[in-house]
């Protein structure tokens, strides 16, 4: 299968009937206004992206940053017209857009399909109604369910965008959202931990002490759980964390929050860390003391004869298993000082294996 070649056009906040507490699309995307999005500009941009690499990728135009199906019909025609021409000419392979769950009625979907749009990404953010109210989203979890169902009726590919870390978020609401979204069976999910952006209500709440953003480590844990959950339910997570932009990197727009350009890599690191730790915990509980209900596993380890732990992994997974800047190695050294831990790159295998005192656990 060819890799995706995304050609993004940002329409910051266009079509949005509400101003969410966290939203400042111009700051996030580094773009403002859409007057430059003329038919000629759209065609030229597509041509520049594709160039001589037409057959190298699956090229898809994406309209992001606003509620596409909520903008005026004339503007939808203006944006989709030249894009559809490029689709018919075989220069691109697909078109997608992002929108609100309460803006995908039958007429809206029919219009999209008339221009060859096959993928719609819904800005869901959370499936907890109280969090949606706090964020001033203007839609409910039930409307998300109805939107996905309606898009499915028209055989559209459906994506869901989530924002863990909104005001009122807890592990309980994270799990609630994970379960509810997996029941909808979207084709893919994007996970963007909440950032506090300048000139937003959330920034005002943060400065007033009314909102506490996620730490980077907590954001990583939330995202790792969500990613693992969706993957277990055969739902692809295509991105974790906002893409780096000059505006965000400059620090002029970012007030607070877990902005980390390597968030996707860190989340995968966390997934492997948790898998290894589960092996250790299960081994200790079964072979060392079958009733650890009154003991903390770490305390038990500190009083038990050292175990020998070897972790084997293929070269392709070295950085993912060991962690960015060896963060997983450091974590296990500090948390389990009484374990003899060794890390081995093994070119003969294609899986990760945790070996504890001769017993192998395949991750």
Language model region names:
Residues 12-16, 192-197, 243:
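Short glycine-enriched loops at secondary-structure junctions
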């Amino acid at each position: 299968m060819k890799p995706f070649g995304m050609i993004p056009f940002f329409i910051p906040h266009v079509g949005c009937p509400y101003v969410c507490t966290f939203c400042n699309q111009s700051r996030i995307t580094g773009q403002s206004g859409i007057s430059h999005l003329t038919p000629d500009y759209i065609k030229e941009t597509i041509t520049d992206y594709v160039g001589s690499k037409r057959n190298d990728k699956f090229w898809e135009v994406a309209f992001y940053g606003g509620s596409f199906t909520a903008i005026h019909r004339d503007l939808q025609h203006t944006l989709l017209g030249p894009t559809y021409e490029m689709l018919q000419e075989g220069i691109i392979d697909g078109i997608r857009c992002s929108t609100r769950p309460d803006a995908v009625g039958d007429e809206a979907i029919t219009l999209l399909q008339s221009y060859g749009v096959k993928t719609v990404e819904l800005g869901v953010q959370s499936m907890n109604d109280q969090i949606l109210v706090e964020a001033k989203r203007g839609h409910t979890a039930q409307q998300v369910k109805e939107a996905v169902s309606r898009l499915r009726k028209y055989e559209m590919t459906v994506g869901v965008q989530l924002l863990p870390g909104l005001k009122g978020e807890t592990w309980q609401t994270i799990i609630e959202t994970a379960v509810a979204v997996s029941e909808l069976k979207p084709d893919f999910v994007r996970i963007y931990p909440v950032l506090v952006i300048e000139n937003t209500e959330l920034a005002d709440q943060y400065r007033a002490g009314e909102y506490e953003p996620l730490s980077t480590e907590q954001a990583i844990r939330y995202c790792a759980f969500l990613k693992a959950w969706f993957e277990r339910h055969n739902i692809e997570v295509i991105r974790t964390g906002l893409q780096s932009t000059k505006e965000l990197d400059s620090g002029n727009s970012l007030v607070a929050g877990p902005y980390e350009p390597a968030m996707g890599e860190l989340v995968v690191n966390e997934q492997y860390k948790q898998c290894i730790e589960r092996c250790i915990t299960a081994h200790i509980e079964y072979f060392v003391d079958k009733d650890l209900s009154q003991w903390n596993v770490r305390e038990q380890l500190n009083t038990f004869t050292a175990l020998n732990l070897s972790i084997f992994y293929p070269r392709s997974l070295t950085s993912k298993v060991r962690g960015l800047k060896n963060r997983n190695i450091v974590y296990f050294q500090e948390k389990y000082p009484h374990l003899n831990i060794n890390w081995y790159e093994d070119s003969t295998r294609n899986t990760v294996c945790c070996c504890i005192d001769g017993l192998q656990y395949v991750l």
